[in-house]
Structure formats: C-alpha cells, structure tokens
Amino acid sequence: MATQWEVVIGLETHAQLSTVSKIFSGASTQFGAEPNTQACPVDLALPGVLPVLNRGAVERAIRFGLAIGSTIAPRSIFARKNYFYPDLPKGYQISQYEIPVVQGGQITIQVPANEKAGKPAYEKTVNLTRAHLEEDAGKSLHEDFAGMTGIDLNRAGTPLLEIVTEPEMRSAAEAVAYAKALHALVVWLGICDGNMQEGSFRCDANVSVRPVGQEKFGTRAEIKNLNSFRFLEEAINYEVRRQIELIEDGGEVVQETRLYDPDKRETRSMRSKEDAHDYRYFPDPDLMPLVIGRDWVERVQSGMPELPAAMQQRFVDEYGVSAYDAGVLTSSKAMAAYFESVVAKAGAANAKIVANWLMGDVSSQLNRDGIEIDAIPVSAAQLALLLQRIADGTISNKIAKEIFATIWDEKATDEGAADRIIDAKGLKQISDTGALEAIIDEVLAANAKSVEEFRAGKEKAFNALIGQAMKATKGKANPQQVNELLKKKLG
C-alpha cells in the first residue's frame, strides 16, 4: 500500500441489548422465531399505538457508559430519524441525535504485531464520540419468494446501542483490534450476547484516505453491516486500495454507502451516503425526555462486575501470573471465573501451573471440540485435584496430560476422578530413591556409548540417558530425581 497515504477509519457499532422485550414494546426479542410472530401493534406501527421505553435498555446503556469512563447524560431525548425502507413500518426510526445518553469515553486496544510489515505490537487508546439508544429495523428476506422480497418484522424494535468512535484508527488492524475489544467488553458486561452470526454485534466502517501530513479528511465511504472480524478487515483493506487507486488515476472518491461482498472480497456501491439533515431529525413527541438521576447511576454502578483491566492487574498482583497470561485469562468472564475456581481449590501457590494449563492443554482441547470454556466437561474441582497431584509429586506432567484427556473424554462426574484413574491404571510416579538408582544403574550399563559421549562433552547424550530412564519406567519416574541422580552418578 502506498506510504504517502494515511488511512482514516471510524467505526459505528450496533450492539443488540440483551433485554427480554423490545425497546418500546413488550414483544419478545428472542432470535429464530417464525417470521412476524414477535411483532406487536407498536412494532407494526398500527394507528394509535404509543411507545413505552424499556428501563432495562437504559440501564444497559448506563452500564456501558460507566465501563468506558463516559459522561451519562442527566437528560437526553429521543428523535425520529426519517427515511423510507420496506422493513421500517413507521417511516422513521426512533433514535437519539442531539443529546445521546452516553457521551465520550475511551477503549484501550492491543494491536498485534505485523511481522510481514515489520511492525511490533502496540497499545492505543480509541476515543468514543457517543453511544446512543435506538430501535432496530426489520429484515428483508430475498429467498424463497419467487423473485419478490418478504419482510420479517420480528427484529423491528429490538433495542440497539450504537457506539460511535472518533475517526482515530489508521489501519484495518487497529479497527479489528478495537472491534474485538468492544465485543469482549459488551459480552463481559452482560449487555449483549455478541453473537455476530445472528446480527447481535455488527459494524459500519467509515473509511477515507488523505495524503500524509494533510489535516483535512478525505471523502469517506461507509461500509455497512460487517458481521465478522475477518469481513471487517478485508472490507477496509479493499476499500483503502480502491480509494487510493481511484485518486491516483485522477478520479474522485464520492460519499456513498457500500456493501461488502465476501465471495468476491470487494465492496460495491449501495447508495449515496446521506448526511444528518437528509434524515430530518426532530424530537419524538410520543416520548418524554429521558431523565437519569444520580441515584439511578449509582444503583447501576453498584451492580457492575469487576472490569477486565482491573481483574488483569489483580491476577498479576494476587496470583503472580504475567501480564500477558492475565490478559489471556481475562479474555472472557467465563475463562476468568474458571481460573479462579480452580485456584480456589488447588491453592494460590499453584496459580501459575493453573494458568499454564488453561492456556495450554485446556485451550487446545476446547479448540479441538469447538466449545467454549463454560461448556468444559472437566470441572474446576477435577482439574484442581489433577494439578495438585503434579505439585505433590504423585504424577508427572506427562502422565497428568493423559489423565486429563481421559477425564475429558469419559465426561467423568466424580471430583476424585484423577485419583481414581491414577489408582486404576497404576500411574503413580516413582519417587523412591533406591528404586530409581537401581533403574539408572541398569540404564548406564546398557548405554555405555552414551556415557562415553557425555563424558566427552556431548550434552545431547545426557538427554538420551534421561529418555532411556523414563522409557524404562514407562514415564512414571520423577523427572527431576532422574536428572539429579544421573548427574550424581556421571560425576
């Protein structure tokens, strides 16, 4: 990509709030129902109906605002955003324009290293402009209608929190890092389920380019409804290339809305991009101003979970894990909870081995089976006992991996599964010095060549002798004792 161009990106993210009912009606928000079975008279915009604000949606917006250090507006208003679309029965969307409920705020992101480009990993803070409440529209269905379009209004009225950043991101990598951080946060807070396939979390990317050093922004294009992190990255990268090539060929970028085609991996024009005045915003006369008192904010604050950044630091301070490990362990609330449950039973002294196992064998098995940590078939108590048996020398780490796989595969329910399997299979580690010395003497006698090579300065020969000793004990020997006894006997 040409280095004389600077990329400017701002994201607008729509997070469906996890309320049982819609933002202005009592209809269900459950996903997957038969079309138009969850649309009440308010959602259908029948004559004479009036909207009633869902308190739960407001509280979820407050929770988000508190988490990002924003200002919660003591008084905000709802506005009508006027436009025509078949899946918008009223002919307008109830949203917020002049006074949003959440104002400002920041999210810190970790941008991974780009080895191909020679760029190291770095941290960046993205400032948010606002987050406002609004209702979702219905959905147009283009299949199974013999060339016509069907309208499903089940989604109409589902509460959304639209989260808008400042145009501060300078690459697709930064945009994806921000989207992932935001996604993790709204799921952590319990305000959105984050299911991107179902449309619970989707992004619009505003992309423009300008010559390096120029202060004025270039003309932007908005790419709508990106519902995967991969699509977000691909769409931005394509759009940046398209705009640069267009300008360098003497053309001009036009302000427009574009869609991303994942099959062709390109964006295509959808319509000219509207400005705010095109929507003719005005206050909704059917809704009173939203007044949020200090006491309401404090009640929400009192129910806030510990935030990921604070938990990361606590894990470093309390359990002695590295900052990187703490970041991985707090990547989801379920992972953090499982870690602390295991540590509570295994003991804080074993926190580091717990962390290593969660990031190693446990994560590997989860990925293999395609499940999340909250569906793990090995309970915290079972894993804690297994790790205690490593710590007290009953079994080796290698044997522990075999036992873990057995507990996982048989979906054992007994807390003492590790001890049961150790006894049933005779897996206890050999730690008796006399027994180990006898085995090592046999190994040295049978491997005279390796002994000579070691004494000649070849370190690899020592590892070969350890391997033979472990083989002779079928992996049951205490590796540390084998190492020490070999060194002693070899002088």
From Swiss-Prot:
Q: What is this protein called?
A: Aspartyl/glutamyl-tRNA(Asn/Gln) amidotransferase subunit B
As for what it does, the entry says:
Allows the formation of correctly charged Asn-tRNA(Asn) or Gln-tRNA(Gln) through the transamidation of misacylated Asp-tRNA(Asn) or Glu-tRNA(Gln) in organisms which lack either or both of asparaginyl-tRNA or glutaminyl-tRNA synthetases. The reaction takes place in the presence of glutamine and ATP through an activated phospho-Asp-tRNA(Asn) or phospho-Glu-tRNA(Gln).
What gene, per UniProt, encodes this protein? gatB
Indicate yes or no for the key word Ligase.
Answer: yes
**Pfam name, any one:** GatB_N
Please tell me whether the keyword Protein biosynthesis is annotated for this protein.
yes
Similarity annotation = Belongs to the GatB/GatE family. GatB subfamily.
Quaternary assembly: Heterotrimer of A, B and C subunits.
Q: Enzyme group, top EC level?
A: ligase
Recorded hits in SMART domains, A to Z, give: GatB_Yqey
